[in-house]
Amino acid sequence: MYSGKNPSALRSQQWLADSLIALMADKAYQSISVKEICQNADLTRQTFYQMFSSKEDVIRYTIMKGCETFKASLSLYEQVDMETLATAFFCFFREEAALVKLLAENHLEYLLTEQFSLALPEIMDLCTERKKAFLSNPYLKSFIIGGLLNMILEWIKNGDGADVEELALLFTEQFVKDTPENH
């Protein structure tokens, strides 16, 4: 995946990502070709392969950009505790529900887990010190990401309109009650 700073290349990268997501709204991911993505973005296959190695790479890029947006939203808080983290997470995904639904419909949820797991260390840096120490356990990190993402997927799949704060509180009550700082 391209990671340089060239504005033209970055723009092409975004156009290709937007093209794939737009195509996924009408067609299954598996049946979309690189040629179709390029035609829809009005770019060449050569440009595609300069930016990405595969369609999966395009999805990773899209999710990675979302992770960056999420991290930026967390940096606005003075302190990030577990409830703040969960609330911000659900608020972010409420805005990204259409994308998550497309990923779920195409069995690409594992890419959400993969990319948010990669972003978690930076997200944890925004957490309060006591939580940071607690969250350094790799099993607990997996639990948090898995729990939050599966709640997101269930919420979007059901489309039940559950309130963001209600979901964050539900997660926090289940998770926080057994943390070291509460004993």
Question: PLM features: what roles do these ranges have?
Answer:
Residues 15, 33, 47:
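Residues in the helix-turn-helix
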